[in-house]
Design a protein with these regions (language model features):
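Nucleotide-activated chemistry modules centered on ATP-dependent adenylation/adenylyltransferase
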Residues: 1-176
């Protein structure tokens, strides 16, 4: 099974910069771009996504946590959580509107997910508990944390690792 390479566009500067960086640095890498639409994005966010689509020459998939509802996804889940707003202690917004739609989008395919978190940011970022998703943080000085390395090197991940190493070897042999 072919490894999918995906990159999420949040609407912020870091994910946009990462998309541009990856296109310039790895022009032959077939990256799928996606965004998780909460229904509460600013018009400027949608404009950024459109501008990136034009620059990248690819459609950015719009993932919505609630497909068959007259409400936008945020309002839908706000009602489900009894009007309780998300916070750093209750991250239902991140889980329901971003992580779950992303994991549904990639399914069980082997995936390398590129995440635009800088090395100076004091947060881990998304590291999936699903064995088929490997998160990589190209803007970090230390790209992989210890738990990611341990996860990546498990025997159950051998086929995914073999495919990644083959793709790196092909790139190295072609002089990139």
């Amino acid at each position: 099974m072919k490894t999918r390479h995906v990159l999420g566009i949040s609407g912020g500067k870091d994910s946009a910069a990462l998309a541009i960086y990856m296109k310039k640095r790895y022009p032959t890498l077939d990256i799928e771009y996606y965004t998780c639409d909460t229904g509460k994005e600013l018009d400027e966010t949608y404009q950024l996504i459109e501008n990136l689509e034009n620059y990248l020459g690819k459609t950015i998939q719009k993932l919505r946590a609630v497909e068959n509802s007259h409400e936008d996804p945020f309002d839908h889940f706000l009602k489900r959580y009894g009007g309780f707003l998300p916070s750093s202690g209750s991250r239902w917004c991140t889980k329901k509107l971003k992580l779950e739609p992303f994991e549904q989008y990639v399914g069980s395919d082997p995936v390398v997910s590129y995440v635009g978190i800088r090395g100076n940011e004091d947060r881990e970022g998304y590291i999936s508990k699903k064995s088929n998703i490997q998160s990589i943080f190209p803007f970090r000085k230390n790209i992989w944390s210890e738990d990611v390395v341990q996860k990546a090197l498990t025997n159950s991940n051998r086929d995914v690792l073999t495919e990644i190493y083959r793709s790196i070897d092909v790139e190295a042999r072609s002089g990139r």
